[in-house]
């Protein structure tokens, strides 16, 4: 399914106001866990400027955000408006649009750039599709049984809390 069928404002989209953020694990931090844990935890993945201190260098206003589940599958994490670019972090806020789809829409990315995390909308629209829509929002990894536990405290807390 084309992304525009779910996110209808992308039909007439140009690359000037939006960027897509496909968040990927960073060391022991896993974006899908942050998304499942809380809005505040997930917000932390949007304010980070990266090593070059400007992940969204163009004057884009909005971030379509997704968290990597595995491989080339990403789950929708919401839309954020960039309010301020000064300082050590971006100042962003959630946009209520498509709130009911947070944690439910699964995007499959098929582009050649598998290392990047920030993309122009035109690239994502050409190289991605909606693979699935969960009935209920993603709440983290399912408990796999005590004999299979090889998880961090943070992962276990997420399972326990949900």
Regions found by a protein language model. Give the residues of each.
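Contiguous surface segments at macromolecular interaction interfaces
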Residues: 1-19, 25-27, 34, 72-77, ...
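Generic detector of short, locally flexible boundary/turn motifs and exposed helical patches
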Residues: 27-30, 45
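Charged, amphipathic alpha-helical segments
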Residues: 36-52
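Short coil-to-beta transition motif at edge beta-strands of beta-rich domains
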Residues: 51-70
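Assembly/interface hotspot detector across virion components, adhesins/toxins, and nucleic-acid enzymes
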Residues: 60, 67, 82, 143-146
